[in-house]
Amino acid sequence: MIRKSKLYYITFKDLYFKILMDKVDKLYYINLKRRPDRNDHFLNECLKANIPTHKIKRFEALDGLTYNFEDDELILFKNVDYRGKSFENKIMGNQLSHYYILKEMVEKHYNYIIICQDDVIFRDNFLTYLNRVMNSIPIDAEIVNIGFHEFASYEHFVAWDLTKTNDLEKLGQKYNDNICKLNNTVNPCSLAYIVTLKGAINLLVFFKKYGFFRATDWNYNDYLNYKNIFYGSSIVLCTGNPSLGSDIFGK
């Protein structure tokens, strides 16, 4: 009887966490092959957050240091403002990684996905908070940012204090109980964000027509601000781990 009870409990618990992520088709994380430490970190965070393993998908990041960019890829970067910078190829690899995940989302007809950098730290009870956000997404939303740093500038960043929940005053203006309109001075750094299918389609059309202008994060920010749909979760759901450094601006 004890064994049956225990098995039932485990099954119920797994079902509960599955239900909390029911609206999310996939949670992608971007990870360089040469950074197994970051891969281990991310999977450990997912384990602690009880994220169902079948929802998690690793996307092997395009390594700008070694990747051979095709002509049809290079044309997307003809107007970028970081041309000639020492980190140019690294940003290009990162930007295409996000871009190709959007393409996969559309090809697979996913309604909602989450894209994460591999250094994220999830808030306690992450799935409960995420479920509230998923049930509150505005009808015109294309991206909803859920991950933020307290401060970030190139390779230097400070993690958000995830023990607090009074985040709205730093982020922006209330839209509903779980979503806010972000201030245009906020940079989520493309750390962790929800994408809607409509958003992925619109972004791909935009990038195909105009290409990229800035690095991944600011390209998103400018696009969303222009359309007045710069959304974020009212409570920060995850932040970055400073001890893992930056794959783009680090050595």
Where do the model's predicted regions map?
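An acidic/histidine-cluster motif and surrounding catalytic segment
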Residues: I2-C116, V120-K251
